[in-house]
Amino acid sequence: MTDEPSQPLDGEDLATAHWEDARHWISIYADLIEFKRGILDRIWRDLTKLQPVAQRAAEVDVKIIEGQMQGYQVRLDLWYTRIRELNGLLLDPEGRMIRYKGKDATLTVREFQLVKILLDHPYRYFTVSQILKEAWAEPNLFPEEVRNYVQRIRKIMVELEIPCDVVNRLGRGYALEFRAQQ
């Protein structure tokens, strides 16, 4: 059985003129890759516990999953290219810069990490503890520090006139939401 992992998913339109759609597809493909990575980790962890026949079957499954992941990576790379073409919001990891329509701002390391995780996963809510662990890998920082960085990011987005907001929902956390294009 051959899977066509590099084919677009239903509803995917690489010709979209909306950069928020591109960010959604980036998030989807990144999540698919991470999901498959988790499956592979479980398979490798459990492989030695299986009978030889089951081990061979699992090895076939691993090849299929790796092929799917390669296809997802191709699609992810296409979306990263597309978002750059859309003349929209760009992140420069080397310079820790955020750019939008000819305006830019240099971010601190933590500001950049926070913006990146929110932009990589638009509309997904992150609790303070998730931000501390996933964005900064420093779970021992104080929750107030997250709130301070969120305020700083909001201010930068207003200054650059970026059409998105960092919202906070009680019990859910923080998420980046795009405003409708006008």
Predicted regions and their residues:
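Positively charged, aromatic-enriched patches within helix-turn-helix-type DNA-binding elements
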Residues: G102-T106, Q113-Y149, M157-E159
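A structural micro-motif at secondary-structure boundaries
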Residues: L90-Q113, A175-Q182
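Short E/K-rich amphipathic alpha-helical oligomerization segments
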Residues: D13-T16, L32-D61
